[in-house]
Amino acid sequence: MKKILIANRGEIAIRIARTCNDLGIKTVGIYSEDDSSSLHLSKMDESFIVDEKGANAYLNIKKIISIAKLSKVDAIHPGYGFLSENPSFASAAKRAKIKFIGPSERSLKIFGEKTQAKGLAEKLSIPVIEGSKGKVTLRQATAFMKDLKKNSSLVIKAVAGGGGRGMRVVNSAGDLKEAMDRASSEAEAAFNSPELYVEEYLKNYRHVEVQVLGDGKGQATHFHE
């Protein structure tokens, strides 16, 4: 790669640009109408405005791909947030014959739908938390909670969600309906899908993430916690 477009702003865009500079890779930045003086632009070799204000500028797939073509980049790095987990963005880059630095469209679709991702983990014999196999109704969630051990709690999650949105911990079956109603409304507002699934809630555990890097040719490694 000789030139990449960084489809993001702020700290992550600066970090990517610094790494590219160390590797001798030219960078192209983008910015919204109200981000014209943002620090990340000073770290880029070239910068282009996306004619929108605020976060919407960094979510405009059509305009970002157009800039990528115009600037003749080899690849696009989405950073995190914004379009980084959007399968349509990965697909658009592929159609434009520009490498997407991130998971494939297929992988993004699978992991964007949490019950599919969990099903894949089970298929690969990876231990998972006890929970529903897919979206649930109030009746199914109530039955699941009754089958849990005494004094156990349940966590409601958005099928299409992430970042804690559409999530509720329920300690009593009597609170389940209200919690599901609220979680469903929140999930629909955030992810355009009201669907929920449930899992046993594990108390006194930590959320741990592991970064994985693949070369697109079957080789992969991880960076621990």
Label every model-predicted segment.
Residues M1-E225:
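N-terminal beta-alpha lobe that positions the nucleotide/phosphoryl donor
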